[in-house]
């Protein structure tokens, strides 16, 4: 085992190389690795944040869709209620108008009946006077009297 100066020189060169590597080469490599791991960690954090924001956006969209559906259903229900109310109002107005028309027709019919009765009374009175006049002008004869009464009945 020969330990000579070459081995000692190789050890010194190796130590100088190790020191040089530790002093000048190793820190930039460590910095590059640290920066890369930081970028990867930041990218993963951004991905997680983006995923969380996407989930939150999906939830907001679902809530807004549900709210829109509820609003739409509420508006439809309100429109149906308004339509029913309008239909009921139209129906009640039509019934009131029909009742008014019927009452007016009854009143007109009653007036016509009253007028017809008045006219009939006038005609009956005129016919009675004419009949009495004719009876008084003729002799009192039973057959003639009966014929006059039959003629008056026919005219009435």
From Swiss-Prot:
Keywords per UniProt: ATP synthesis, Cell inner membrane, Cell membrane, CF(0), Hydrogen ion transport, Ion transport, Membrane, Transmembrane, Transmembrane helix, Transport
GO terms under cellular component: plasma membrane; proton-transporting ATP synthase complex
Alphabetized Pfam families for the sequence: ATP-synt_B
Transmembrane annotation, as ranges: 7-29
Principal localisation: membrane
Membrane topology qualifier: Single-pass membrane protein
UniProt-listed NCBIfam families: ATP_synt_b (TIGR01144), PRK05759.1-2 (NF004411)
Record-given protein name: ATP synthase subunit b
Organism (species): Burkholderia lata (strain ATCC 17760 / DSM 23089 / LMG 22485 / NCIMB 9086 / R18194 / 383)
Origin organism lineage: Bacteria, Pseudomonadati, Pseudomonadota, Betaproteobacteria, Burkholderiales
Gene that encodes it: atpF
């Amino acid at each position: 085992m020969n330990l000579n100066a070459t081995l000692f020189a190789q050890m010194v060169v190796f130590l100088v190389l190790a020191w040089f590597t530790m002093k000048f080469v190793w820190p930039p490599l460590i910095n590059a690795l640290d920066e890369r791991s930081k970028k990867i960690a930041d990218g993963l954090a951004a991905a997680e944040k983006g995923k969380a924001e996407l989930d939150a956006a999906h939830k907001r969209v679902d809530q807004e869709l549900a709210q829109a559906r509820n609003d739409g259903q509420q508006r439809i229900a309100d429109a149906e209620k308004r339509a029913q109310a309008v239909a009921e109002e139209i129906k009640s107005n039509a019934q009131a108008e029909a009742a008014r028309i019927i009452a007016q027709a009854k009143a007109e019919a009653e007036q016509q009946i009253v007028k017809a009765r008045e006219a009939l009374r006038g005609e009956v009175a005129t016919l009675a006077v004419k009949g009495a006049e004719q009876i008084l002008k003729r002799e009192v004869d039973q057959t003639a009297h009966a014929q006059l009464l039959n003629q008056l009945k026919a005219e009435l």
